[in-house]
């Protein structure tokens, strides 16, 4: 990280705590990279017919979950054994919430891979191009959130929230289109699956926004 999370701890006497926290922050960045890869693979499955990717996503998800549990356990250990001061509590609680957001994005990516397998039974829908654009925007939000994390950007929340507005607009527009088509006589399943896709993407974007806002909180101590 350009500026280490552990540097938010100002007491120079607690070198052990700082070293342990550096290990945690490296795990957080590794987890973030795995979630980015999982999200990218779900896009390939949905829009490029790369149907081998759902199995790869499932393998990534195992490592994501392992890191999530490990980071939570480390943070919980700090909270119970290190007698953290108020600034420590802010940092540790933000990290625990942040990795929870990453874990949820990973879960949604795995779900998208499974939905992609089901959609192969149907011809491509005209809405898929717009859904792909929505997916790219959500991925960009995650990328930006993780960049902000490495740089400890105090403006992270504001930057990514503006990007989230684009995803929300796309969701509203696509949902109305799909809801109308659901009422037309014909095959309903692909419409419902695409509605689930855009809902997952909207939630993934929300979690990316949460990550950015938690970065701002770590740096400034102010909630957005």
Curated annotation (Swiss-Prot):
Main localization (coarse):
cytoplasm
| Annotated GO CC locations | cytoplasm
Query: Which InterPro entries does the record match to this protein?
Result: P_transport_PhoU, PhoU-like_sf, PhoU_dom
Q: What PANTHER family does this protein's entry cite?
A: PHOSPHATE-SPECIFIC TRANSPORT SYSTEM ACCESSORY PROTEIN PHOU
Please state which protein family the record places this protein in.
Belongs to the PhoU family.
Described purpose of this protein according to its UniProt entry: Plays a role in the regulation of phosphate uptake.
Question: What does the annotation say about its assembly with partners?
Answer: Homodimer.
Q: What is this protein called?
A: Phosphate-specific transport system accessory protein PhoU homolog
Q: What is the lineage of its organism?
A: Bacteria, Bacillati, Cyanobacteriota, Cyanophyceae, Synechococcales
The gene name reads phoU
